[in-house]
Amino acid sequence: MLSDELKLLVGLGNPGTEYEKTRHNVGFMVLEEIARKNNCSFRESKKLFGRTCEYGSGIEKTRLLMPNTYMNESGKSVRSAKDWFDFQNNQLIVLVDDMDLPLGKIRVRSKGSSGGHNGLKSIINHLGTAEFKRLKIGIGAPSNDQQERKSKTVSHVLGRFSKEEFIILNFIIQEIISCIESITSNNWEKISTRLNSYKPDN
């Protein structure tokens, strides 16, 4: 069914060169690699409050969106895209960093709470529902101690990956792209299982 097909991929992050390649921007990084592989260039869209590009044609056309609103207002951009392109919530996948997952792990969910992530929280508020697909990419936590973790959260998510971490991340990004390219109207569960069980050394 058309309503089950992928229409919009949203990568969450913060705009600006000072945030490029930071852990919080891993969603942007995935979309940038997808765009590179499909020879499409991002362009500014004032009406969508973000940068967009598209590839494919007809019912296989997929749009990429990187909000320019900063993380906490990501929902404004996603809502604008939903209204403009007139797609259903189940045609949306949001790619987002997750500090509760170690680097190298992926979690796919078809719905759920924000998990404390301000970008997801904003999207849920603007769409009026938590029933949309999200792909959480582990970036690890700065500490196992809760108090220390809280004090170091901002510097951690706005910090950049080390060379060793980036090697692992690249495996993750390539696996995500491979799965996204194979999504059809009836294999989401299979894709979810594959990503949820993926290990970078596979």
Swiss-Prot record:
Catalytic activity, as annotated: an N-acyl-L-alpha-aminoacyl-tRNA + H2O = an N-acyl-L-amino acid + a tRNA + H(+)
Family classification: Belongs to the PTH family.
A Pfam family of this chain: Pept_tRNA_hydro
SUPFAM superfamilies: Peptidyl-tRNA hydrolase-like (SSF53178)
HAMAP family: Pept_tRNA_hydro_bact
Gene Ontology MF: a single term: peptidyl-tRNA hydrolase activity
Gene behind this protein: pth
Binding partners and assembly: Monomer.
Residues annotated as site: Stabilizes the basic form of H active site to accept a proton: D97
Cellular component GO terms, alphabetical: cytoplasm
Predominant subcellular localization, coarse grouping: cytoplasm
Any one biological process term the GO annotation gives: rescue of stalled ribosome
Listed name of the protein: Peptidyl-tRNA hydrolase
Disulfide bond positions: none
PROSITE patterns in the record: PEPT_TRNA_HYDROL_1 (PS01195), PEPT_TRNA_HYDROL_2 (PS01196)
Keyword field: Cytoplasm, Hydrolase, RNA-binding, tRNA-binding
